[in-house]
């Protein structure tokens, strides 16, 4: 949280697991502190972690802007990310055990194209092997 308080316009991209739940929780805390936060979630909602579902409900109750994204919504994410002060990677953390595919892979590519915007990863950058530090494939 302290690393993010210097930013006003914040985009957080959240995966379906507990790393995504951490991003959602952070987004709520920043929203409470009057930051302009936009949350983007991807994945099958039926497979979201219990913590993820809890924070999604909390974010919706607090009216934090949240978008459930598939490939058709990536252009909206890109538009918001380009206007942000920081993009927070809460897609995958220490639980990742292979190459990232689908929407997450596209998001990695798009986030890597944001040259003038700070990027902060929760845990570790998505796509990085947590044991070896070697990328599985695409990595933020």
Where are these regions (language model features)?
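Glycine-rich phosphate/dinucleotide-binding loop and adjoining beta-alpha-beta core of small-molecule
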Residues: 4-140
